[in-house]
Amino acid sequence: MKIALDPYMFRSTPLAELPGLVAALGYSAIELSPREDFIPFYKHPRANTADIRAFKASLKVAEVEVVTLLPLFRWAGPGEEARQAAVRYWRRSIQIAAELGVPEMLSEFNGGPADPAECEALFWRSMAELLPDFEREGIRVVIEPHPNDFIEDGFAAVDMIRGINHPLVSFSYCAPHTFYMGGDIAGITEYAGDLLTHVHVADSFDFRGSSGLRYIVNIGAGGGVPNGITPPRIHQHLDIGQGEVDWDTFFGTLKRLQFDGVMTVCIFAWEERARESSVFNLQEIRKRMPGAA
């Protein structure tokens, strides 16, 4: 099992300096999430050949590897034009991953819950177009359900990935999304079985708690949700132990399943103490998963 850091809280750090920073924090692997100067959210990648070469050189010096590249594009819409653009962005991102020697790419179902059938149709179209690219480069694509995607439930997400029926497509369990996935950590991860190749580590509060009043969000007059708009999804990416994720069940189930994939620390909540947070969560994982690299 490899422990990686999503360095999103350090995104202002120049890319060439990032591997050294990650190594100084005690990590040897990076999950590279969107950066404006490399692969931005929902836009065409910015990285050119010189950028990639410089980044590879800095990775080598720091003895750090990129184990996962995480792009986010609208491959499930909304709309065909957005989907086609997303496929173009994906293809360039796959090229970048291949040039970096990254073995897997991680993303979300995307789309939205307001029209799940339409989003699913667009998603299948994108997968049909992109699978040959993943096959050509030998890169795994790992998918997780995210709050406000067209699929949010963990069991439904596993069923969808199983239905893709491709050896290069697998499932990621994102701990801070636990409560939108249905709350059953052991059930979902066991149901995924061999499809579970990646997990995200961060804590979150249970939005369902206290009769649904854990969070109170006022939208417009009277606090109602306008027609055609789904309620807001609220979650956090906190340090282990700061929320309500059942970590004994999470780590205990992964041990029982003999999980041997990528475990990424993806804390977003504490930019003012990003270094301390990154070190703390690495120590917590090593304490709970002895032998993890």
Question: What are the language-model segments listed below?
Answer:
Residues 274-293:
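C-terminal helical cap(s) of enzyme catalytic domains, especially alpha/beta-barrels
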Residues 31-56, 110-115:
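Glycine-rich, proline-tolerant flexible connector loops at the mouths of alpha/beta enzymes
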Residues 18-36, 101:
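Catalytic domains of carbohydrate-active enzymes, especially glycoside hydrolases
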Residues 2, 29-30, 36, 128-244:
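Acidic/histidine-rich catalytic cores of soluble enzymes
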Residues 1-13:
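Boundary/entry segment of secreted carbohydrate-active catalytic domains
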Residues 1-3, 26-28, 60-67, 100-103, ...:
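Short, well-ordered coil/turn segments that N-cap beta-strands
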Residues 5, 22, 30, 59, ...:
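Conserved, mostly hydrophobic/aromatic
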Residues 16-17, 53, 57-62, 75-173, ...:
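Active-site acidic/histidine proton-transfer and metal-coordination neighborhood
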